[in-house]
């Protein structure tokens, strides 16, 4: 095996190069360095406490010199006195480099592989730094120093450029400038993506074999680092260290503006940009800016269509690793995090915490109009559209505009019929599992969201929130003409009553509608589609609302009660019609009993109860009735017996069943 010098193990990046690396490359580099140094027998370092990313905030110390500094002083404070031959064979062998003999330090007699490493080592050991810069002010390191010194003249020149801002080396591909030639060369290599060590499975190239070895674990699934507390295993040492903080709760990085603390420096930096608004990472295709490189990388995949993360169980691919992890939990039924307010359960703690913000409204990002808080800026931006009415996502097929991208994607499936989640009952497809689950409740009639005040249940959480405002009386959206609305959607719909605008037109008959759902409902009159079926009598309906109203025939529910006479009705239209009876003048009076009516036809029907006249006869059984409506009700009893053979209306007291609701009511009076 060929020998490798220590400087081949310790690789430098400048501040500019470090900024160019993506999050995956940074993490991989950290893992390699941590794992490599852990394998050095004589280099006993406190690497676990070392934040590699911090070194690239202030890249003023040569990393190789730092390593050799620690090489001189062992962990217990004694001199190392060990030779390179004692380093593990996997890192450095006993043989020297071709043509280069082992160089011995005159300071302590240690042997170090390679002349440049020796130079650095001797200078560190002797404290000899011939190039000193006297204008350098206080450093942001743990100790303050003036007049920073350097072991090499080129390092001294590069450092000077930090103060002058001079960057004489330009990249011809992207135009970015660098303070040193080495930085430019490394930057160009990163941009080209070339390297001598290539992955046999995916073809990705790397500059160092150790990076390739770490990358190969993404294919093999090898996880050598196991947490002692929860037995969770990790492919990379840095991931293991990050995970450890979930047990200890350590959050060493605190924001000076809002005092929020973070376990990782990268998370802290990302958070800081929410205050400053800085977005240094731009998409090369559409120039959209992002606060961190990972968000930019994820966004760029929307242009390329790349989805590198695949589920092993179902083969579904994702552009983000977090999306894959969330998806994998859908194969497991376990949801350990349950909301005590609404009963909704979650697979992940983060999802649960975000959900709780919906109840409390205490998120860090506040809406200036209504004061509601959100967990992230994107959620706040989406919410602000409910106030502004902005709808940036427009469907090219039907012209409908939507406020949110997720709503737009769901809407497009209505046209295409494509979607990963298909309903087994009606075949309708959906993009998101949450929307699919909500749709399934239209078939099962499940209502998991209950009002704490009145006990009324709803299929959708938004319907519950809308209902809760009927108790509080809150109506924040006011029309200029005086009417107030519960939510922004109702307010927008109300405005069309003044303008008369009807933007949604049926392509078949040309009829226009003010709301998209009215158009969708109307389309079923052309297609004849009736997806909602009554479980009792199997009658089908084109609209869910019609099914709900129909079900009252079987249940006997009469939610609309007249305050004047106490009469109850199953349907709102009948109730409103009845209310007018009390409001109108009753000028038609029965001469026999004195009862008054608003219309002459009502009086004529009533008079038949005195005369015993029954002009309306049933052709099937010969039974006669005083009114046509009574005959129609009677005919339904024949239809039900013929077609269903059942009596759906059962008396709860004696168990006797009846074909019609009116028969059940008459029977109840006998009890």
Curated annotation (Swiss-Prot):
Outline the inducing conditions.
Induced following exposure to ionizing radiation.
What is the annotated localization of this protein?
Answer: Nucleus
Q: Which GO terms describe its cellular component?
A: nucleus
Q: Which residues cross the membrane?
A: none
- What residues does the KRAB domain cover? 4-86
Q: Does the keyword Zinc-finger apply?
A: yes
Keywords of this entry:
DNA-binding, Metal-binding, Nucleus, Repeat, Transcription, Transcription regulation, Zinc, Zinc-finger
- Name the coiled-coil region(s): none
UniProt cross-references to InterPro entries, sorted A to Z = Ikaros_C2H2-ZF, KRAB, KRAB_dom_sf, Znf_C2H2_sf, Znf_C2H2_type
Q: Where are the zinc fingers (C2H2-type)?
A: 134-159, 169-191, 197-219, 225-247, 253-275, 281-303, 309-331, 337-359, 365-387, 393-415, 421-443, 449-471, 477-498, 504-526, 532-554, 560-582, 588-610, 616-638, 649-671
GO process annotations (BP): apoptotic process; regulation of transcription by RNA polymerase II
GO molecular function terms listed in the Swiss-Prot or TrEMBL record: DNA-binding transcription factor activity, RNA polymerase II-specific; RNA polymerase II transcription regulatory region sequence-specific DNA binding; zinc ion binding
Q: One Pfam family, short name please?
A: zf-C2H2
Question: Is DNA-binding included in the keywords of this UniProt record?
Answer: yes
Q: Which family does the entry's similarity section mention?
A: Belongs to the krueppel C2H2-type zinc-finger protein family.
- What is the recorded function of this protein according to its Swiss-Prot or TrEMBL entry? May be involved in transcriptional regulation.
What protein name does the entry list?
Zinc finger protein 443
Species of origin reads: Homo sapiens (Human)
Q: Which gene encodes it?
A: ZNF443
């Amino acid at each position: 095996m060929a020998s490798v010098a220590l400087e081949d193990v310790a690789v430098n990046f400048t501040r500019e190069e470090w900024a160019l690396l993506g999050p995956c490359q940074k993490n991989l580099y950290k893992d390699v360095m941590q794992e490599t140094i852990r394998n050095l027998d004589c280099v006993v370092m406190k690497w676990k406490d070392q934040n590699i990313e911090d070194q690239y905030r202030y890249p003023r110390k040569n990393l190789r010199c730092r390593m050799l500094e620690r090489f001189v002083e062992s962990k217990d404070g004694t001199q190392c006195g060990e030779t390179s031959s004692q380093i593990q064979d996997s890192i450095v062998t006993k043989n020297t480099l071709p043509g280069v003999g082992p160089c011995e330090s005159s300071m302590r007699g240690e042997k170090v592989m390679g002349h440049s490493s020796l130079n650095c080592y001797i200078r560190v050991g002797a404290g000899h730094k011939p190039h000193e810069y006297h204008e350098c002010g206080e450093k942001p390191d743990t100790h303050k120093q003036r007049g920073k010194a350097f072991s090499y003249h080129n390092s001294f020149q590069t450092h000077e450029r930090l103060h002058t801002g001079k960057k004489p080396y330009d990249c011809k591909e992207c135009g970015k400038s660098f303070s040193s030639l080495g930085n430019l060369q490394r930057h160009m290599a990163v941009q080209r993506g070339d390297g001598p060590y290539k992955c046999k499975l995916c073809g990705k190239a790397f500059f160092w074999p150790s990076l390739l070895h770490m990358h190969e674990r993404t294919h093999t699934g090898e996880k050598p680092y196991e947490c002692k507390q929860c037995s969770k295993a990790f492919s990379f040492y840095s991931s293991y260290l990050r995970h450890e903080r979930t047990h200890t709760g350590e959050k060493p990085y605190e924001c000076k503006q809002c005092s929020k603390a973070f376990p990782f420096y990268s998370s802290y930096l990302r958070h800081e940009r929410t205050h400053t608004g800085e977005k240094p990472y731009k998409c090369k295709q559409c120039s959209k800016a992002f606060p961190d490189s990972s968000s930019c990388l994820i966004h760029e995949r929307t242009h390329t269509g790349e989805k590198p993360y695949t589920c092993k169980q179902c083969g579904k691919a994702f552009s983000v690793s977090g999306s894959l992890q969330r998806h994998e939990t859908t194969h497991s039924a376990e949801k350990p995090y349950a909301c005590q307010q609404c009963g909704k359960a979650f697979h992940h703690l983060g999802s649960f915490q975000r959900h709780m913000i919906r109840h409390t409204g205490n998120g860090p990002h506040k809406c200036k109009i209504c004061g509601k808080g959100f967990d992230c800026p994107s959620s706040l931006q989406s919410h602000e559209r409910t106030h502004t009415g902005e709808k940036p996502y427009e469907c090219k097929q039907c012209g409908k505009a939507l406020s949110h991208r997720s709503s737009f994607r769901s809407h497009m499936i209505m046209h295409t019929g494509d979607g990963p989640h298909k309903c087994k009952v009606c075949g309708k497809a959906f993009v998101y599992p949450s929307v699919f689950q909500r749709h399934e409740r239209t078939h099962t009639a499940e209502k998991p969201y209950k009002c704490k005040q009145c006990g009324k249940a709803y299929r959708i959480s938004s319907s519950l929130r809308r209902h809760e405002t009927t108790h509080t009386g809150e109506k924040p959206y006011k029309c200029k003409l005086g009417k107030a609305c519960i939510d922004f959607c109702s307010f927008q719909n109300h405005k069309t009553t003044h303008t008369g605008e009807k933007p949604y037109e049926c392509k078949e008959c040309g009829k226009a509608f003010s709301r998209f759902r009215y158009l969708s409902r109307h389309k079923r009159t052309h297609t004849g589609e009736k997806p909602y079926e009554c479980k009792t009598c199997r009658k089908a309906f084109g609209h869910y609302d019609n099914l709900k109203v129909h079900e009252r025939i079987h249940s006997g529910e009469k939610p609309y009660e007249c305050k004047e006479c106490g009469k109850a009705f199953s349907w709102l239209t009948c109730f409103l019609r009845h209310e007018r009876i009390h409001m109108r003048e009753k000028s038609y009076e029965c001469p026999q009993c004195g009862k008054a009516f608003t219309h002459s036809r009502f009086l004529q029907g009533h008079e038949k109860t005195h005369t015993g006249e029954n002009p309306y006869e049933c052709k099937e059984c010969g039974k006669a009735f005083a009114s046509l409506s009574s005959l129609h009700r009677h005919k339904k009893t024949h239809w039900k017996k013929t077609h269903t053979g059942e009596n759906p209306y059962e008396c709860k007291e004696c168990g006797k069943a009846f074909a019609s609701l009116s028969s059940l009511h008459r029977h109840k009076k006998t009890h």
